[in-house]
């Protein structure tokens, strides 16, 4: 059963969270957030595979992610979903006796613009022979078409978008070489040269032959394997990359990476990197503005949990959750989810337990997660997907509605049967796939059919979505990267300011739609929009109509 609804106060000085009645008993706090299962109606017939007869290793239990990205530039976010594939007996103790034909693989679903999708995987050339885990999207060559980086066991693959509906594997040509188990990645322009660089997170030195007698079902955990170093590749702005792992200082740290995201947490104009590790201290790499990073997680208060122990971190999200104008950090976890309030002093205060958010999910294992205004009331909400860790134990999922001033309420039981339906969730990605102004979600379920959750909330407020287009192209060599990754956007409406930074990856093994979504509540228009581009340019727009997708071009910004 779900816990009673919480009033969650995101200030450490306020003390323990106080229980309040269920939302349906409190009219002024009644939630309108609702989701419906739209999987069948949308035509997304995807089933994930972990490649064996039963879960028998860390590799099989990790799961896979997804990404929303507009690969054909028609204004409708398309969906790429990852899967494991059939494992040979050398990689599993429980091989399939009758492997499926064809083998399980990734799928690309083209958005038809009417709420339905068409599987175009083979046409696009996006069916690799890979046990895939995570995916991120970025226009690495600034040609106007979004490319893909797929990570998995044994290698990572860089797909170039050819602009005609097809993709080409350019991994070797681009100089991307990642061995071992690359589990996640993110894109960032760490040197602000207008070309996005690539960070690849690696998990452990997985050995399928190793068995731990003391492990449950002879299933070794992350600490039974050696950790790995992550990789940082500098974009040379010519379609190739250079491995700068050691030069940047990233290579000095060995972890067990699960999730990674990058954003300018300290507001100095340069993107930093947060690495969520499993059973190992987390990393926060602060950008030193000279091509190198310093690891400050301990000093910043994000290396360990409140008990001083390493956490089982999964999916990190940077967002201004407490409304302070600074980027806070939300991390899903196998035990206690963590909400870390940015203290404005190059650090964070862990308020997850004090707020009650951590306890609300303590009985679950949390994986995919997103921080969005699901009801467009001008306040950020949090959605979390759960599932068993080492067994296929399905769990229900969670929705926390933002109430303002750092307070949240658990409204999961009122959010629709698709939220309370138990699955073994892993990666999740978020987008307004039908362009109705409400954020939807897609979740990959381990070894089972995936779920498309359509946001059908009623009585919602106004909204605006912003698509950024940096000035740099494959012919123009000045300005910000084409995707606007690293840009920070302020939206002012009805006297309130909201801040969102354009990031690449977010949550667990996944990436959300690149358009920045702002719920506006009753505001009849947007008073002001300010874009702080990575190039240093600042662009202001005033008196903008709401309830639409707005494209902002850096080429129109003052020089």
Q: How does the language model describe each region?
A:
Residues 35-38, 116-126, 166-176, 239-251, ...:
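Blade-edge beta-strand/turn elements of extracellular beta-propeller
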Residues 44-65, 102, 124-136, 175-186, ...:
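Repeat-based blade/solenoid architectures
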Residues 42, 52-53, 359, 389-393, ...:
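Gly/Ser/Thr/Pro-enriched helix-cap/hinge segments flanking short amphipathic alpha-helices
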Residues 82-101, 202-225, 384-393:
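Short, conserved, GDST-rich strand-edge loop motifs in beta-rich repeat architectures
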Residues 79-83, 143-152, 198-202, 268, ...:
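Hydrophobic beta-strand segments that make up the repeating blades of beta-propeller
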Residues 105-111, 228-235, 286, 397-402:
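Beta-propeller blade signature
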């Amino acid at each position: 059963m779900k816990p009673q609804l919480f009033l969650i106060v995101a200030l450490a000085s306020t003390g323990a969270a106080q229980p309040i009645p269920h939302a349906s008993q409190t009219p002024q706090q009644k939630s309108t957030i609702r989701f419906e299962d739209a999987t069948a109606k949308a035509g997304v017939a995807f089933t994930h595979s972990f490649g064996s007869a039963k879960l028998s290793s860390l590799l099989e239990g990790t799961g896979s992610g997804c990404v929303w990205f507009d690969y054909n530039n028609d204004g409708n976010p398309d969906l790429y979903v990852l899967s494991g594939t059939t494992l040979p007996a050398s990689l599993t103790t429980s091989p399939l006796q009758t492997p499926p034909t064809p083998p399980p693989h990734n799928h690309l679903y083209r958005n038809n613009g009417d709420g339905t999708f068409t599987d175009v995987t083979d046409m696009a050339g996006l069916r690799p022979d890979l046990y895939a885990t995570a995916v991120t999207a970025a226009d690495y060559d600034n040609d106007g078409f979004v490319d893909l980086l797929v990570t998995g066991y044994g290698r990572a693959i860089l797909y170039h978008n050819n602009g005609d509906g097809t993709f080409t594997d350019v991994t070797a040509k681009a100089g991307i070489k990642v061995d071992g188990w690359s589990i996640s990645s993110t894109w960032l322009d760490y040197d602000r040269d207008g070309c996005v660089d690539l960070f690849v997170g690696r998990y452990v030195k997985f050995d399928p032959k190793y068995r731990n007698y003391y492990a449950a079902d002879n299933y070794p955990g992350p600490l039974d394997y050696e950790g790995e170093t992550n990789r940082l590749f500098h974009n040379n702005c010519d379609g190739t990359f250079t491995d700068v792992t050691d030069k940047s200082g990233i290579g000095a740290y060995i972890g067990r990476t699960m999730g990674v995201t990058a954003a300018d947490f300290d507001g100095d104009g340069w993107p930093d990197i947060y690495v969520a590790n499993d059973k190992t201290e987390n990393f926060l790499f602060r950008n030193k503005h000279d091509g190198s990073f310093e690891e400050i997680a301990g000093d910043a208060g994000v290396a360990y949990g409140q008990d001083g122990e390493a956490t089982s971190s999964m999916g990190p999200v940077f967002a201004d959750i407490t409304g302070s104008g600074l980027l806070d950090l939300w991390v899903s976890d196998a035990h206690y989810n963590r909400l870390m309030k940015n203290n404005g002093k190059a650090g964070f205060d862990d308020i997850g337990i004090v707020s009650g958010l951590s306890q609300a999910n303590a009985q679950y294992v949390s994986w995919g997660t997103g921080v969005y205004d699901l009801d467009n009331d001008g306040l950020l909400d949090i959605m979390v997907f759960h599932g068993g860790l080492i067994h296929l134990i399905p769990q229900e999922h969670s929705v926390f509605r933002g109430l303002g001033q750092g307070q949240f309420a658990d409204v999961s039981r009122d959010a629709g049967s698709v939220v309370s339906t138990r699955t073994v969730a892993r990666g999740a990605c978020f987008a307004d796939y039908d362009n109705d102004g409400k954020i939807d979600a897609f979740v990959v379920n381990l070894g089972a059919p995936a779920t498309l959750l359509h946001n059908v909330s009623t009585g919602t407020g106004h909204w605006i979505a912003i698509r950024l287009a940096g000035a740099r192209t494959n012919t123009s060599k000045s300005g910000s990267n084409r995707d606007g990754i690293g840009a920070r956007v302020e939206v002012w409406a009805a006297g309130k300011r909201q801040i969102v930074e354009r990031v690449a990856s977010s949550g667990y093994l996944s990436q959300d739609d690149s358009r920045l979504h702002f719920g506006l509540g009753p505001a009849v228009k947007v008073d002001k929009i300010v874009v702080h581009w990575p190039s240093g340019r600042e662009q202001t727009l005033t008196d903008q109509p709401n309830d639409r997708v707005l494209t902002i071009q850096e080429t129109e910004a003052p020089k």
